[in-house]
């Protein structure tokens, strides 16, 4: 369904989020999924498939996982939960960007620190989070409409950002409450769509 929707609406890529692989093993595919078949079908429709993965699993299985995903026809990987910028993590970004480039795959560093110029060396880095994005509504009230109006000017200048827009359960800031299960968005649906 998502591949067909993307093809109908000119959306270049879809993301298959958590659940396609084993919790701690990217080389184990959930038996209820068939990523190679999805990639094959998507390619026929002109849509690329990206997969979500935890950084710790990528770190342990970098070469094997990227070779496997590339062989399936996966076009990119969204890597999550790095949440720091010490020397070991910066080295991880470099190793992953290099391997992804070798495999001709895009990267989305989610749960990342803000950009620092790495895209100049690795144009396959599509985006990175490095921002208080909309998913913060699960645990914080910091992602206000005013914040969302400011970040294109204060954060976006450094490079593309993975903001995760699109909240459709909307309330005004004074009615907002933090909810991890059914997160709300502050403001209006029109604001989210803009």
How should each PLM-predicted stretch be described?
Residues 1-4, 9:
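An acidic-aromatic substrate-binding cleft motif
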Residues 9-10, 73:
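Short loop/turn motifs at secondary-structure junctions
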